[in-house]
Structure formats: C-alpha cells, structure tokens
Design a protein with these regions (language model features):
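Extended soluble regions of mature proteins
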Residues: 1-204
Length: 204
C-alpha cells in the first residue's frame, strides 16, 4: 500500500540586503510503502528547507488491536470498532470485514478488514473514508520508493527531533560574516506533543 501527499511551497524574503529563497516539496510527495509479504515498510520524505529528499527503512510493528462489540455504518459498509496503541498514541479504528484486507491509513494495519476511519485519543491524527470502489477493475503499479539518501528509523527520528538545529546550521552556513540566526528554545517540542509518533520502541 502507498500513501502520498503533495506539498510545494516557495518563500522568497528580502530584508536589509539579505535574500533567502526556500523551495521544498516535489511531485512525488510523502509516501508510506508497505510490502505485507516481506513485512517491509519504507517511508519517503520530499525535500524540505532543512533536508534533501530521503527514504527510511522503518520497523514493521504489529499493533496489538482489541476488537470491541460496538458497530456502526460508514457509508454503505458495516464496521466494527477496534482500539490499539502505536508509538505513544492510543487509536480507535473502525474497520469493515466486507473488505477483508488488513490495510489502513498511515501505519495502522493488521485488522481482519479495511480500516475506513481512525483517530487517536488526543485528536492529533484523524482520517475518514470519503469514497471507495470495491471491487475494482483498475490496475495499479506500486513500486518501492528509492532516493540517493537512505536513513534507518533512528536516524530519521533524530533528524526530525532536531530539524530546527539542522535548518539553523544550514541557514547560518550561507549568511555573511557577522550575521547569524538564533532559535527560541522554549518552542522545541521535546516530548513530541504535536507529532503523530510520540514514543518509539527503543525508548521504552
């Protein structure tokens, strides 16, 4: 399965003789590639102001779902409720056995049916099915994303946790002598409060 989003943003700012241009994002966007036969998950991140595009070999984690008795209708599908914890967040998911595929959005998978709706308890993550065609006669070619730079999951997490430091170092390396940027340390998200993944398996 593959999830993607496109993001292209350009910023051009001139102030006191200093010109800066940031362009990031690309037509490929962010991807989550999963191979269920090989239990393999590859992430792809587009170019940002701080980092070039790169891929990540993530860890295949089976979420310990607990299926509840509650049911609801989503669109034309009968769905069951399931709850589970994944990397520091507690999720509620609604899946349908009418589409008996263990897939879902983001990194949520492993239920006996397709996940059509999911949300974490703090509402930092929320996804709802808008429309679906099942079965379908369309054929899709899904290929593993490849980039020159590859990181393991620990390297990726470190980079994201220190993204401000990396960007600051990059900016300062391009500034004239005597000119530098500094950051507001009070705004650093040290506990990953605003990130979807808050706690990783090696941090327990």
């Amino acid at each position: 399965t593959k999830f993607y989003s496109q993001n292209k943003i350009g910023i051009n700012q001139e102030n006191e003789g200093i010109g800066m241009t940031f362009k990031y994002g690309d037509y490929k966007g962010e991807m989550i590639y999963r191979n269920f036969n090989k239990e393999k998950i590859i992430l792809r991140f587009p170019k940002s102001a701080a980092l070039d595009e790169y891929t990540v070999n993530d860890t295949w984690i089976k979420i310990p779902w607990e299926i509840k008795e509650e049911v609801r209708k989503i669109g034309s599908f009968n769905c069951k409720k399931a709850t589970g914890e994944f990397r520091g967040r507690f999720y509620t998911a609604w899946f349908t056995e009418e589409i008996p595929l263990p897939y879902g959005p983001f990194k949520l998978y492993g239920l006996p049916g397709l996940i059509l709706q999911a949300e974490d308890s703090e509402k930092m993550f929320s996804v709802n099915m808008k429309s679906i065609e099942y079965p379908t006669n369309q054929e899709f070619e899904i290929t593993e994303p490849v980039e020159k730079e590859r990181k393991n999951i620990k390297e990726h997490v470190y980079a994201q946790d220190h993204i401000e430091d990396i960007l600051l170092e990059k900016l300062n390396s391009k500034m004239p002598r005597g000119v530098s940027f500094s950051k507001n340390l009070s705004k650093k998200d040290t506990k990953r409060v605003y990130k979807i993944e808050k706690l990783f398996e090696w941090e327990n």
